[in-house]
């Protein structure tokens, strides 16, 4: 993203008004089918911003970002990227400090304690819940029983070697347990990315990134 196009003018306006409920479509890293990735971040007090990562050898001068407006949006398009490329924003502050920051709008990240963001294209996922969606049609949810099971993915169950269950393993093991115990719904403790393994995930560092402890977004 090297400039604000006509189609982006309203999303940008709403973002600065604090009313853009789809800001993730504007900011972050958006990888296209041709391998290009558009990066956009908000750093209103920065003197300069660049994106550094696996795709440019972490070279601070390879991909400087353009300040897109007076409110502090910065953007750049990188020509050749791959899924899982790690990256950060290199920010020069107004007082001359150099900071390396992860992308708060990233879809995927390194597994903590590493904290770089990762390029990841979300498209192409195939859902397999058509039968369940069909059965749900016509039912009045307000008249059905509700029994909610609150679950922290990392501590509910682990493999024999102590490693975390993956999202796939959880999907295989959890429904039968819930049915046996009489639960109708699941409330996940924060499944988004967070830094400290000893917590339940409330120190969120990536609201758009499912925790990489348990697998990829797909």
PLM regions and their residue ranges:
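Short proline/glycine-enriched turn/loop motifs at strand-loop junctions of beta-rich domains
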Residues: 42-49
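Short, surface-exposed loop motifs enriched in S/T, G, D/E and P with embedded aromatic residues
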Residues: 61-68
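Short amphipathic alpha-helices and their capping/turn segments at secondary-structure boundaries
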Residues: 135-138, 171-182
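Short beta-strand elements bearing conserved aromatic residues within extracellular beta-rich modules
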Residues: 49-51, 87
């Amino acid at each position: 993203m090297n400039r604000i196009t006509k189609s982006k003018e309203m999303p940008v306006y709403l973002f600065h008004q604090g009313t853009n409920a789809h800001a993730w479509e504007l900011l972050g890293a958006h990888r296209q089918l041709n391998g290009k990735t558009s990066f956009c971040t908000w750093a209103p007090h920065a003197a300069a911003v660049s994106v550094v990562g696996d795709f440019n050898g972490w070279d601070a001068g390879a991909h400087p970002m353009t300040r897109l407006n007076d409110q502090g949006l910065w953007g750049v398009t990188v020509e050749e990227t791959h899924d899982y490329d790690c990256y950060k924003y290199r920010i020069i502050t107004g007082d001359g400090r150099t900071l390396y920051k992860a992308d708060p709008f990233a879809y995927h990240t390194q597994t903590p304690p590493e904290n770089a963001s990762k390029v990841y294209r979300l498209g192409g996922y195939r859902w397999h819940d058509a039968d369940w969606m069909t059965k749900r049609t016509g039912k009045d949810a307000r008249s059905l029983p509700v029994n909610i099971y609150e679950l922290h993915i990392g501590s509910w169950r682990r493999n024999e070697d102590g490693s975390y269950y993956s999202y796939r393993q959880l999907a295989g093991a959890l429904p039968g347990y819930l049915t046996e115990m009489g639960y109708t719904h699941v409330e996940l403790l924060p499944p988004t990315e967070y830094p400290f393994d000893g917590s339940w995930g409330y120190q969120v560092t990536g609201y758009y990134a499912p925790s990489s402890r348990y697998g990829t977004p797909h």
